[in-house]
Amino acid sequence: NSLIALVVFGRATGHRLKEIVKPNTAHDELPRDGAELALTRLDHFRHAKGGSPTAAVRAEMQKTMTRHAAVFRDSALLAEGVSKLAEVNRRMQDISVADRSLIWNTDLIETLELDNMMAQSVVTMASAENRKESRGAHAHEDFPERDDANWMKHTAAWFEGWGGN
């Protein structure tokens, strides 16, 4: 279901963008400090000398998400998942990147990917715990019915990662 939805809505988005984005039209200016933030993040992880290897933290994150955020879940499991994932996320402060080079550095790339996935995982787990209904791929066993009166809405979430951004 999710894959076909991505294909359908991706296609629709592409068609709509073709209508509203005109060739050679200027875009909004990027934030002046955007490059600085990206380079600071890159250097932060490139020079990380903690005791937690990226692969170990990633495996723990995946295990936690698989166990606590699968399609069928209940309130207790989700609450436990939020707590466990917070512990795993704290390990990002102790991450270890052995390769310091800037050329073909798969260790650094995997760490940056983990940082992105960790942010998404934390938000996904917290959002699932917060939603008190079942809808789509979210089957909450304590709330088996869809609740349009309270949950027919979008949820916005912010995540403060390593740099608070």
Residue ranges and their predicted role:
Residues 1-165:
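Glycine- and aromatic-enriched mobile tails/lids
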